[in-house]
Amino acid sequence: HHRLDWQTYSLVAANDQLLHLYDERLSVIISTRGNVPAIVYWGSFLGQNPLQHDLFTRAVLGGGVDLDPPLGIIAQHHDGWLGNPGVEGCFPDGSGSFPHFIISSSTNTTTSANFTLRDADLDLDLQINVDIHASGVLTITGALSNRGSLPYLLHGLRFALPVPPRAQELLTIGGRWGMEFGEQRTPWVQSTMSVSNNRGRTSHEKWPVVFAGTTQFGEQHGEVWGCHVGWSGNFDITLDGVTEHHKHMLVGEKLIAGELVIRPNESHSAPTVYAVHSSQGLSSASQQFHQFVRSGLRHENASRPVTLNTWEAVYFDHNFETLTKLADVAAHVGVERFVLDDGWFSGRRNDTAGLGDWTVDSSVWPNGLTPLINHVKSLGMEFGIWCEPEMVNPESDLYRQHPNWVLHSGTSRPITGRNQLVLDMSRIDVRNYLFTCISQLLDAYDISYVKWDHNRDLVASPAHSQTLGTYELLGRLKETHPQVQFESCASGGGRIDFGILPYVDRFWTSDSIDPLDRMLIQRGAQRLMPPEVLGTHIGSPISHITRRSHSLAFRASTALFGWLGIEWNLLDASTHERDRLASVIAQYKTLRPLLHTGLSFQEDHPDSNILVHGVSAHDQSQSLVSVTRLANGPSSHVDPIHLHQFDDDATFIIRPLHLGTPAYAPHRKLPQWIDAGSITMTGRHMSEIGVVCPPLLPASSFLIQIHKVM
């Protein structure tokens, strides 16, 4: 392919009314002909030829206004747009409901455009910034400023992303506690739908990630447009396929009426909207999100130790002797970090009391945590701890002393959830108290990791200031304790998004560690997040949530593709199980550099009961592929898997990788290459012919290692 010099390539514009932002795979054309900037093209790179505005000018239809209503990045009714507006709000007397912004100034480079819009009548300014990141991710940010003398009640600030009519299908992601990140496909012809969240945190039920694509788009084929709003509170993504025949996504934070007031000479910054385009299917779109995360959004920390969390091992039954024995076994099998979960602080013998009182319970730990930490450290492991700072139990000293610190609406009695209430994180005194408690804990003990939980939804409460307060507290703690890694947990995967990502190093993907469910949960979560930031643990033989039983090999094969951990009382494990687990962890450590830096991909398969995914090094020197049978299908065979990540003319050696006894279905003879131990194929052979697989039992995986012949 012809490659351009991206540093010297000039702007493509027929006149000053078209801006062309680009990188080597993406073009974004912004029209400035109207009152506000409008994205008129968002897709594959368009090349060097000059563009004319007529390319984007449509007919004016009868039966409506006498112009083709433009879809601005901020859509507004004053321009004839009859869909949802980008800015919704008013002054206290109800005026100002229809702001009319006009571009007052702009600047741009080849990868960014910055616009200042002004409504002189309402004394409102709006700053919009559009940027193409090196990963190919498009970001839109904006800030609304009140230059007048009256407060402005903002009800919504959302950005519009146009999608061409050929995008006929939608992929949305959501689920429930213990079964997050399920994928749902729906047709998108002439309809409008909304992915909307009112729960006050990112939520298990609906995820702020949406993909639109051409008919039957797949992992490696079809054109895909995706978006994400980086925010850990309420959000709304409206998918409009009707209004003026402009298919578009209207993306942003969801605000409750009266929740956000912009006072004179103050501003409000909207959550960042992230967008991707791929002409090669879903996996390519996700890889752009992954690259974006890796290259700058997250606080980089290369240490991702194998973790043992004590929750499912002992629950609230904290006992020094038991925990030191558990630490001994953990160190023996290769664990690198030992995490003490819920139950260590004052009054916390069950989930009805103690939240808010963040001091070590002297009745359980008469000598503090130092003896346990010293024992863990002597075994060569790091020590981590669990907390849930945003919550409080009514049965706690904190609540008895400060009942007014609880988040509530008006005079109504707040509703408990999991026997707990929510602290008002908008209050600086609340945040200062929590900062002091957690800082004292981190200063007193050698703690390298904090699992930060959030175990209930908000009810009848504004989420905006609550979310910002949590960000501020986490940011302060990260700044003062840069050596500590933080994990975002919210009853599992209830708070995973780009908004909280700068403040944390890891996410707890789901409270369910059942490997059969986790296969689908992790697939969905990796649509946005790279595997190395997702906690993937090997659970006990019987899942504590589903009560299903699975082999260690299957549990390990599932947990391999992420930040590995253990959620299992290893004191109950047999010597054989411990030895097997030690072997798995040793294998993981050799694969960790590949798994945490390579290109993560999914592949389509004709049998919906078969999942194919993997990770390939950027130079294709090595790869690991998983083939999983979720359930029995119409055929006993596993049809060949077609792998599209590899250079056509390069040669590769393919070998099976066994983490235990292979779970082959009944057979007389295996494919010859498996008995032989390897096979050599070109990249073209892998994509066109496919790799022949063995017959698999339900709930089992077959792992393949691929090495490039240099």
Model-derived features: positions:
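Glycine-rich, aromatic-flanked loop segments that form ligand/cofactor-binding clefts
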Residues: 67-71, 77-100, 217-235, 276-298, ...
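Carbohydrate-binding surface patches
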Residues: 207, 219, 605-648
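Polysaccharide-binding surfaces and accessory modules of carbohydrate-active proteins
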Residues: 10-11, 17-21, 26-28, 37-240, ...
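Short Pro-Gly-centered flexible turn/kink motifs
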Residues: 101-103, 260-279, 699-707
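C-terminal beta-sandwich/jelly-roll accessory domains of carbohydrate-active enzymes
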Residues: 631-710
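Active-site neighborhood of glycoside hydrolase catalytic domains
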Residues: 366-368, 400-402, 406-551, 563-568, ...
